[in-house]
């Protein structure tokens, strides 16, 4: 009896070892079951075993991974082989689709950091591009992303640690019979076979329609050392994502093995079928032809022709009235693009009564959208198309930057020779109205210090919180808006600049306002330090209640920075405060703000604080550093003697747009 029991235990152990070894080596699925995979996002397994990564939902992600990791020994030659069948089905017949899917090898199944759209549910805008990401993705991308150097429209690519492909090709397969490549439509909804083979040094990607055997020649072949990328344990699976354009993405079957010898074949006859695209063109029923009297036909024609002419004239007039400029590359920005018709109606036809300000190259109008939302619409003239694509992309990106002390930029509209920028309307206008115009009540010191803290917080977010960092480049009182509760909101993204982590800049405009420009600006270009300089001028502007340059004043008072510095030397710093403050202020706080303004306007950029430090000083969580009016760089710069509202241009590759989107409400 004991001998029989030992035999049973022995064979049971052998079977378990064999099963474990088979799972470690590979698997094959001719259809899927819920217990086989780890699934998240909108991915799901449909009845019949069809794995659906995405549906027609916008901006969504779906993942499906084999639950157990596979062991890879980076110290020795590693290999793997996979074969799967997928289908990317448009939501309806002939529709454009987005955004694509990828086969993924990753050290983790946690992709909570990943973005949809062009990031395919695997990467995000700040994905580390070093080898520490340990990610391999073979993408079937259906949308061209210019920033990623994508090929046109649908393409296949190899991604290592970031979404920019190291190798890519248009989808096709090699026909031995014809001796040439035959194109494949990835987004037709028809099943496509994909083979990915890695033999230790060469990564091959091969495609073919469902009815074609594996071609002898791969679509992509790339020498790569994956032992530098893979860790000891790696997960394998699929990721799919949608943008504003969507598609239903399916996996019908999947085979994987670390060894070519043990690779199991898919049984294509057993695979579930993917749904076909909907054809919403209903058939027109045939009706029996009826004979009409010739006189009746003639009468109908005489009546119909004038009506058609009138309708045609009305249609032509309305089309010309609401005509816009639209190009194919703008489709992805759809939610950020407003129709001219909607803006025309919101502003009652851009009537004079809706005009709330002028500045730069355009006028600002107040409008109300159908839902009751109040907007500000700035109409800018533009003739050249050069740089327009980059400018619109940056406007849309800046529209995604959210902070309680930034004026929300909602979107844009393009017409021939005209660009319209749409932002949220600020009911209390711009701060300069209250500082420099006697018809408006002057803000108290408590209101002023609160506004200064608001704008410091906004600028600190642009410099340190936004990704990539943004340089504002035109901080001044006329670009600070006040909402319904008199909170400070920083506007004027018309001149903002992005700064990438390497310090490279891409400009939406290349101008600045005299009196607010740091002395090094023309020599070295814009930087966070030049923004801090302008903020220092803004501190003095708000505290003293005057502009940085007043040509009608005596010489000793003409330049704000120099005047404040001289008064500090004469122990009369508080005399520079705005007389309209009266006695309702804290002397120590006013002196601190004035000194901080001088510190921010130091001639030496490296001696200026960053905006994080400025916030600490304003909230008095940290004392000002020890310096005096005689310290090097304090109060020494003399700006050019021109009108303070003048702007100058600095050479730049991008189109030029000046002044605030919201500048000058109520003037």
UniProtKB/Swiss-Prot annotation:
SMART domains named among the record's database cross-references: S_TKc
A GO term from the CC aspect: mitochondrion
Key word Zinc-finger present: no
Stretches the record annotates as Legume-lectin like: 24-257
Keywords for this protein: ATP-binding, Cell membrane, Glycoprotein, Kinase, Lectin, Membrane, Nucleotide-binding, Receptor, Serine/threonine-protein kinase, Signal, Transferase, Transmembrane, Transmembrane helix
Annotated TM spans: 295-315
Iron found in the keyword field: no
Class in the EC hierarchy, top level: transferase
GO MF terms, alphabetically ordered: ATP binding; carbohydrate binding; protein serine kinase activity; protein serine/threonine kinase activity
Record topological domains on the Cytoplasmic side: 316-667
Glycan-linked positions: 55, 110, 124, 128, 181, 204, 225
Topological domain spans for side Extracellular: 22-294
Catalytically driven reaction(s): L-seryl-[protein] + ATP = O-phospho-L-seryl-[protein] + ADP + H(+); L-threonyl-[protein] + ATP = O-phospho-L-threonyl-[protein] + ADP + H(+)
PANTHER family registered for this protein in UniProt: PTHR27007
Protein family per UniProt: In the C-terminal section; belongs to the protein kinase superfamily. Ser/Thr protein kinase family. In the N-terminal section; belongs to the leguminous lectin family.
Designated name of the protein: Putative L-type lectin-domain containing receptor kinase I.4
